[in-house]
Design a protein with these regions (language model features):
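DNA-contacting surface of Y-family translesion DNA polymerases
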Residues: 105-249, 331
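Charged substrate- and nucleic-acid-binding regions of tRNA-handling and nucleotidyl-transfer enzymes
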Residues: 265-334
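Structure-specific DNA junction-binding interface
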Residues: 1-68, 135, 143-151, 184, ...
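A short, charged helix-loop
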Residues: 73-90
Length: 344
């Protein structure tokens, strides 16, 4: 994503592997597109496909063509009415970004099979039968831009961190390590988006696919005294919640923490005895250290062994980001000089 951000004045990260780039004011988009593709491959080794069009929805259509047809060389540009019409005629209605399964069924009853058929429907019908989102998609396919760039990702309204265990867990000590780690991660995410939590949920459950084992599923919701993103507090209350729901005698498969009632501000409680300024300075220092040295500083309750961690035997290699996984190649080099060549 950093390589993409360097090429354009404005970028919206849409997902972990997808982004929208604002190319307004750029004349030679063909050259820029080719340059971006080459730079990403050189910098990461990852092939990337680009779809360029007047709107985000049309850009998604173009991107599908760039991925699907080798003749495009990973770059498809919809910059004329003829190209737009042809692309929509070749795109099934179910492949359009923003059109759900229920809407597809409704449109098919109207004889709509392709994206082009959809654009031929009267705008009044679309507005009446497909809500504001459907009308926006209809306009975007017409080439009318209706979706603004979100250069700053919206803050999450709920944060969940959970993980299945690598093996069944029966003791509360191991469960506490996992819960503390999940709660710590949630607190970190809160601080990253400058938010505060007003409540949290801790949950545990067994493996419901193991019919030969007794089943147990419980959760508890805890309302925090004041909105907070402090790791010590969130871990404390998550562990308190675990103690109320943990039951001995079961083999647990998964546990997690969900942060809810997220707000962008906090306020001190009347009887709050915690030195908030001191704790905030401590948290900032820990975040700064962990930013430079990943997860170097953590709470003792989180443990060090991580015996509960999910098994990850089939992970892809991190050849470009982990120095210990850099591929080494053994080869033999044959050298000769001009003098040696003359002697022969």
């Amino acid at each position: 994503m950093s390589i993409l951000a360097e090429q354009v004045p404005e970028m919206e990260v849409y997902s972990i592997d997808e982004a929208f780039l604002n190319l307004e004011g750029i004349r030679d988009i063909q050259s820029l597109g080719t340059d971006i593709i080459n730079k990403v491959i050189r910098g990461t080794g990852i092939p990337v496909s680009l779809g360029i069009a007047p709107t985000q929805t049309l850009a998604k259509v173009a991107n599908k063509f760039a991925k699907k047809y080798p003749a495009y060389n990973r770059l498809c540009i919809i910059d004329t009415e003829e190209k737009r019409t042809k692309a929509l005629q070749l795109t099934e209605i179910g492949d359009i970004w923003g059109i759900g399964h229920r809407q597809v069924a409704k449109l098919e009853k109207q004889g709509v099979k392709t994206a082009y058929d959809f654009t031929e429907l009267p705008e009044s019908w679309v507005r009446k039968n497909m809500t504001v989102v459907g009308e926006r998609t209809w306009k975007e396919l017409q080439g009318i831009s209706c979706i603004d760039m979100e250069t700053t990702p919206p803050a999450k309204k709920q944060i969940c961190t959970s993980r299945s265990f690598g093996k069944m867990v029966e003791d509360i000590d191991t469960m506490s390590e996992a819960i503390a780690t999940h709660a710590s991660t949630c607190a970190k995410k809160l601080r990253q988006q400058k938010s505060y939590a007003m409540s949290l949920m801790a949950f545990i459950h067994t493996n419901n696919f193991r019919k030969d084992s007794p089943q147990y599923w419980r959760n508890t919701v805890i309302h925090l005294p004041i909105p907070t993103n402090d790791t010590l507090e969130i871990v404390h209350y998550a562990l308190a919640g675990l103690k109320t729901i943990f039951m001995q005698g079961y083999q647990y498969k998964k546990t997690g923490v969900i942060i809810t009632e997220i707000t962008d501000s906090t306020q001190l409680g009347l009887f709050d005895s915690v030195d908030r300024e001191k704790r905030e300075r401590l948290q900032q220092t820990i975040d700064k250290i962990n930013g430079k040295h990943s997860r170097l500083v953590k709470l003792a309750i989180q443990g060090t062994g991580r015996n509960w961690k999910l098994k990850q035997k089939q992970l892809s290699g991190h050849y470009t980001t982990d120095i210990n996984q850099i591929i080494s190649i053994n080869c033999t080099c044959l050298l000769y000089t001009s003098d040696a060549a003359d002697d022969t």
